[in-house]
Every structure is written in C-alpha cells, then in structure tokens.
Amino acid sequence: RPPGFTPFRIA
C-alpha cells in the first residue's frame, strides 16, 4: 500500500 492509503474516500 502506498503511504497515506485509505480504504475510505476522504471528501
């Protein structure tokens, strides 16, 4: 996983 990866979309 790349750094700062998130399984949720941050809007």
Curated annotation (Swiss-Prot):
Its main location: secreted. This is [Thr6]-bradykinin RA-11. The keyword Zinc does not apply. Keywords: Amphibian defense peptide, Bradykinin receptor impairing toxin, G-protein coupled receptor impairing toxin, Secreted, Toxin. One of its GO terms (cellular component) is extracellular region. It is found in: Secreted. GO terms for biological process: defense response. Belongs to the bradykinin-related peptide family. One of its GO terms (molecular function) is toxin activity. It comes from Pelophylax ridibundus (Marsh frog). Expressed by the skin glands.
